[in-house]
């Protein structure tokens, strides 16, 4: 498994702008925030969602611009961020490596210095966390992690929002993760430590957790080799594809290694009665999950998919409101 190095940027940065200092709250990884801050984002996400469902106008982003930078392709990330920012009154610009100087020779630092002078918020979906943090370190505006190789914090906030809607607070609950030790699992581990729930991880031999990417301590998670054992006592069972972007050359090997790490009816039966099933999508039915589970009564994947829109509104509002002149 590819190993990564922990970076210590943190989510708070100060940038000098003329004679003023701007205190910037980036959203780079969950470990940068307190329990109260994450709960504030989740609460506001639920409140803003309720306003939309009621047809009540709420457009606090009028006159503001979000720049989205995609070095990794996406469906849900683009649609949810773009729709969400538009719905809150703002405007959106989409950039890709192919359609900007990032794909040629301009450094990530210089791109940040230029782009952040022309917008109010940046979302980046990229490869290494180091690229994201290099951009944030040179940005005048808040930067949101849309996904990196190491972390996927917006998705975990989405999943927790979805859990809260169906089951109430996640504090004191148990989550079961089945599959690879990937960016999703690392953000789940951060969330468990901060928000006070336990996570059981069913991960095959040869795919160890990179301990440099998770909070200290081992009281908030347990690693299993058997998905059924990991699912016992779980209130939520969740998974992801066996082969993440960037590991396509390992696809056949991973199919063999993960063959026994499928969420099926036996795994769900081992979990608590009424346990939820989630998947960040896209899903490969017959591989990491059976059609019976993902299309079954315990699955909330479509509510989960919609909640990317709402969770990210809470995150964007928090970052913009918390980033003020000091």
Language-model regions, residue ranges each:
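Rossmann-like adenosine-cofactor binding region
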Residues: 215-292
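Short Gly/Ser/Thr- and charged-rich N-terminal loops/segments
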Residues: 6-11
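Positively charged, low-complexity intrinsically disordered leader regions
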Residues: 18-79, 83, 151
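Glycine-rich phosphate/diphosphate-binding loop of Rossmann-like nucleotide-binding domains
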Residues: 71-83, 167-239
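Adenosine-phosphate binding glycine-rich loop
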Residues: 274-275, 281-326
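Active-site cofactor/substrate anionic-group-binding motifs, chiefly glycine-
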Residues: 65-66, 70-118
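Anion-binding alpha/beta catalytic cores of soluble intermediary-metabolism enzymes, centered on
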Residues: 113-115, 120-191, 279
């Amino acid at each position: 498994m590819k190993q990564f190095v922990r970076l210590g940027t943190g989510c708070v940065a100060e940038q000098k702008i003329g004679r003023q200092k701007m205190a910037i709250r980036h959203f780079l990884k969950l470990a940068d925030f307190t329990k109260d801050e994450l709960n504030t984002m989740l609460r506001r996400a639920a409140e803003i969602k309720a306003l939309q469902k009621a047809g009540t106008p709420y457009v606090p982003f009028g006159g503001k611009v979000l720049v989205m930078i995609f070095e990794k392709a996406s469906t849900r990330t683009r649609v949810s961020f773009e729709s969400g920012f538009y719905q809150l009154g703002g405007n959106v610009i989409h950039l890709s490596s192919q359609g900007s100087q990032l794909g040629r020779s301009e450094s990530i630092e210089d791109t940040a210095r230029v782009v952040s002078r022309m917008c109010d918020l940046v979302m980046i979906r990229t490869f290494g966390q180091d690229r994201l943090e290099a951009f944030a370190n040179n940005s005048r505006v808040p930067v949101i992690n849309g996904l990196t190789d190491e972390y996927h914090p917006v998705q975990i906030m989405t999943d927790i929002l979805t859990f809260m809607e169906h089951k109430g607070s996640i504090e004191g609950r148990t989550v079961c993760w089945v599959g690879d030790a990937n960016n999703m699992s690392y953000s789940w581990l951060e969330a468990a430590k901060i928000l006070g729930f336990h996570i059981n991880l069913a991960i095959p031999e040869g795919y160890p957790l990179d301990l440099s990417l998770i909070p200290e301590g081992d009281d908030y998670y347990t690693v299993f080799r058997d998905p059924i054992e990991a699912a016992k006592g779980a209130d939520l069972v969740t998974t992801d594809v066996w082969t993440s972007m960037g590991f396509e050359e390992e696809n056949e090997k991973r199919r063999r290694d993960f063959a026994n790490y499928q969420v099926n009816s036996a795994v769900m039966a081992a979990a608590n009665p009424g346990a939820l099933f989630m998947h960040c999508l896209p899903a490969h039915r017959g591989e990491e999950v059976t059609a019976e589970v993902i299309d079954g009564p315990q699955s909330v994947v479509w509510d989960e998919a919609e909640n990317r829109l709402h969770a990210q509104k809470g995150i964007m509002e928090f970052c913009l409101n918390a980033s003020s002149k000091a």
